[in-house]
Design a protein with these regions (language model features):
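Catalytic binding pocket for nucleotide-activated donors in carbohydrate/polymer assembly enzymes
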Residues: 1-127
Length: 127
């Protein structure tokens, strides 16, 4: 196993783009049910493997667009499947990326939404 280190900015993007799979852990302190990483990872055509939450499992089809684990044993089994089966891994990565774009979780779609909200507020204030 390669040495682990934290990465930020461009290095974070390069790390995700170069990974076969990427793990996502939720903050217990914040009681996360999903995080921005749940969109960033598939946006880079990398398979998202995350702790299970009801909310997150409603955003992606498990085993088709992303994958979720509830225990250490689940995680190990899931990792073996993705590392051992390149065609399956690539299929899930591609489907996950498509889900992010189709559902509007990409940066461009989010920015359009923010600008629409801004214009709605601005137009209300002008009336």
């Amino acid at each position: 196993m390669a040495p682990l280190q934290q990465v930020w900015g461009d290095d974070y993007n390069k790390a995700l783009c170069g990974a076969k799979v990427a793990l996502c852990f939720m903050s217990k302190l914040n009681k996360d049910t999903y995080t921005r990483r749940c969109f960033e990872i598939p946006a880079t055509n990398t398979v998202l493997i995350s702790e299970y939450s009801d909310e997150l499992s409603s955003l992606y089809n498990a085993g088709v667009e992303a994958d979720f684990f509830k225990s250490k044993q689940d995680l190990i089994q899931i990792l073996h499947r993705y590392v051992d089966d390149e065609a399956y891994r690539e299929s899930v990565a591609k489907a996950g990326h498509k889900r992010v774009v189709v559902d509007g979780h990409d940066v461009v779609s989010r920015m359009k939404m923010v600008l629409e909200w801004f214009n709605e507020i601005k137009n209300k204030d002008l009336k």
